Amino acid sequence: MTGNIVARRYAKALFALAKKAGKKAPAEYGKDLEAFASVLEGSPDLLKVFANPIISADVKKSVLSGVAGKIGLKPMVINFLSLLADKDRLPCVLEVSALYRTLLDEAEGVMRGQLVTAFALADARQDQIKVKLEKQSGKKLVLSFAVDPSIIGGVVLKVGDKVLDASLRAQLEILKEQIKRGE
């Protein structure tokens, strides 16, 4: 919980700086932060180096500058990550990145979601569904599609913290409960 509060504060601080830096800066900083987070996710050893309290902040910052140079991070993002290194908070960067993405989505009026179906949908059908959902919500929707044969049929839509389960499996479970209760 404490890590989440700390990560939220850092994400809000970077987002506030990005808004002051210009119209395109929030999205650019977000891409840089996500790129750095994906490097850390792909290299657990690097994350261990940043999480190790025995390694000095200077060593962490030199490793950070090497990584930043290879992936081409913006100077403000490098400064932000250096601050995290000074405060021994670099292990929080994955959480900071996710929270920053949430702040950016809210500012841009974007919702993220996942649509689960029993079988793969054609690209044209995916586009139709996305357009229809965007019309209903009035917001831009970034939708990922997944396949789960266990739902038997129908769809399960997850957007934010809401879940709409219109799967055949869920309907069968409801029917089963009604039969048990004698309805």
Curated annotation (Swiss-Prot):
Q: Which SUPFAM superfamilies match?
A: N-terminal domain of the delta subunit of the F1F0-ATP synthase
Cell compartments where the protein resides: Cell inner membrane
Q: Which GO terms describe its cellular component?
A: plasma membrane; proton-transporting ATP synthase complex
Q: Which InterPro entries match?
A: ATP_synth_OSCP/delta_N_sf, ATPase_OSCP/d_CS, ATPase_OSCP/dsu
| Any GO MF annotation of the entry | proton-transporting ATP synthase activity, rotational mechanism
Q: Does the keyword Cell inner membrane apply?
A: yes
Q: Which UniProt keywords apply?
A: ATP synthesis, Cell inner membrane, Cell membrane, CF(1), Hydrogen ion transport, Ion transport, Membrane, Transport
Q: How does it sit in the membrane?
A: Peripheral membrane protein
Functional note: F(1)F(0) ATP synthase produces ATP from ADP in the presence of a proton or sodium gradient. F-type ATPases consist of two structural domains, F(1) containing the extramembraneous catalytic core and F(0) containing the membrane proton channel, linked together by a central stalk and a peripheral stalk. During catalysis, ATP synthesis in the catalytic domain of F(1) is coupled via a rotary mechanism of the central stalk subunits to proton translocation. This protein is part of the stalk that links CF(0) to CF(1). It either transmits conformational changes from CF(0) to CF(1) or is implicated in proton conduction.
Q: Which HAMAP family match?
A: ATP_synth_delta_bact
Q: How does it assemble?
A: F-type ATPases have 2 components, F(1) - the catalytic core - and F(0) - the membrane proton channel. F(1) has five subunits: alpha(3), beta(3), gamma(1), delta(1), epsilon(1). F(0) has three main subunits: a(1), b(2) and c(10-14). The alpha and beta chains form an alternating ring which encloses part of the gamma chain. F(1) is attached to F(0) by a central stalk formed by the gamma and epsilon chains, while a peripheral stalk is formed by the delta and b chains.
- Family, per entry: Belongs to the ATPase delta chain family.
This protein's name: ATP synthase subunit delta
Q: Which organism is it from?
A: Solidesulfovibrio magneticus (strain ATCC 700980 / DSM 13731 / RS-1) (Desulfovibrio magneticus)
